[in-house]
UniProtKB/Swiss-Prot annotation:
It comes from Novosphingobium aromaticivorans (strain ATCC 700278 / DSM 12444 / CCUG 56034 / CIP 105152 / NBRC 16084 / F199). Keywords: Ribonucleoprotein, Ribosomal protein. This is Large ribosomal subunit protein bL32. One of its GO terms (cellular component) is large ribosomal subunit. GO terms for molecular function: structural constituent of ribosome. Residues 1-16 have a biased composition (Basic residues).
Length: 59
């Protein structure tokens, strides 16, 4: 079984964990309806992407 030879210092532990933080998800306002949507994604509320209707949403 692998066992550490030396105790890991707090500095080294922190450097290892420096990439583990979670970032907040990005949201942008839809240019057509104003709903919040993920960037580079189709708007779920109105079906528009990049200024044009991609899918018909609603009735």
């Amino acid at each position: 079984m692998a066992v550490p030879k030396r105790k890991t210092s707090p500095s080294r532990r922190g450097m290892r964990r420096s990439h583990d933080a979670l970032s907040a998800e990005a949201f942008h306002e839809c240019s057509n309806c104003g709903e919040l949507k993920r960037p580079h994604m189709l708007c779920n509320a109105c079906g528009h992407y990049n200024g044009r209707e991609v899918i018909a949403v609603g009735l």
